[in-house]
């Protein structure tokens, strides 16, 4: 809209020394140009007369188009350009007005006298009028350089994005490696705990009984089933005292072949 154009023209005029390639300072930093464009975009989008948000590419394109089409009203020397333009328009109108009667007079002579006359052309002493497009070409060349400088900033943004992506990938790889190490440690701990539990179970199931110190009355069926010894069974003699005959001593010899206890099948 017209109000948005006026807002942009005002912002361009405010920061013209930085963004204009013809009027900017020679010793300027491209980061300052980037910050200036960001400030222009921020001020434009926060203006109350702006109906739609615009990004930096759209505003930079509008700036270049307005410069190329000579629609930017706040340029230095704009009054002189306008005065020279009005002088050009007036001279062109005068030349056209003088050319029309000459053409009519030429046609009149051709019809009656069959005499051809060359029209007289006015040559202006101002050399700039012969090439009205010279300023436009200069504008295009200078603004093309400005476009190349504007395009430098997105490359830096792309490099920064690539560096950030690489940093994120490295961080993710470190997190994944740490998680894998933790998982391996947990697996090792689980294996160690399982091995310790199996060792404890083996120790419980294969406990040794000293028959010489324990009487047969205190032995249970499970103790007899899990009974293991390093000596041959023929050398082991159990002295079992019968409850009814406390004084009598019966000597029982354990045979070589292990006999299955009748209650073993039930308890197993």
Curated annotation (Swiss-Prot):
GO cellular component, one term: nucleus
Region spans: Disordered: 94-133
Cited function: Involved in transvection phenomena (= synapsis-dependent gene expression), where the synaptic pairing of chromosomes carrying genes with which zeste interacts influences the expression of these genes. Zeste binds to DNA and stimulates transcription from a nearby promoter.
Keywords (A to Z) from UniProt: DNA-binding, Nucleus, Transcription, Transcription regulation
Subunit structure: Self-associates forming complexes of several hundred monomers.
Residue ranges the UniProt entry marks as DNA-binding: 1-72
Protein name: Regulatory protein zeste
Cystines in this chain: none
Compartment annotation: Nucleus
Main location: nucleus
């Amino acid at each position: 809209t017209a109000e948005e154009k006026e807002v942009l023209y005002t912002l361009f005029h405010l920061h013209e020394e930085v963004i204009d390639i013809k009027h900017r300072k020679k010793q300027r930093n491209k980061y300052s140009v980037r910050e200036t464009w960001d400030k222009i975009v921020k001020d434009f989008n926060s203006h109350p007369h702006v109906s739609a948000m615009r990004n930096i590419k759209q505003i930079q394109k509008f700036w270049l188009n307005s410069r190329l089409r000579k629609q930017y009203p706040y340029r230095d020397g704009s009054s002189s350009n306008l005065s020279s333009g009005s002088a050009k328009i007036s001279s062109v109108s005068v030349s056209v007005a003088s050319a029309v009667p000459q053409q009519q007079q030429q046609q009149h002579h051709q019809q009656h006298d069959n005499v051809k006359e060359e029209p007289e052309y006015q040559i202006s002493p101002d050399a700039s009028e012969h090439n009205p497009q010279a300023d436009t070409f200069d504008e295009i060349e200078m603004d093309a350089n400005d476009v190349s400088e504007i395009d430098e900033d997105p490359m830096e943004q792309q490099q920064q994005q690539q560096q950030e992506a690489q940093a994120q990938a490295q961080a993710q790889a470190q997190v994944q490696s740490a998680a894998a190490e933790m998982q391996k440690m947990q697996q090792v701990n689980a294996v160690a705990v399982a091995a310790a539990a199996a060792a404890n179970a083996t120790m419980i199931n294969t406990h040794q009984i000293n028959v010489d110190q324990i009487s047969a009355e205190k032995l249970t069926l499970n103790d007899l089933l899990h009974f293991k010894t390093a000596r041959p069974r023929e050398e082991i003699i159990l002295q079992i005292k019968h409850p009814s005959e406390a004084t009598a001593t019966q000597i029982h010899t354990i045979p070589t072949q292990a006999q299955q206890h009748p209650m073993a099948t039930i308890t197993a």
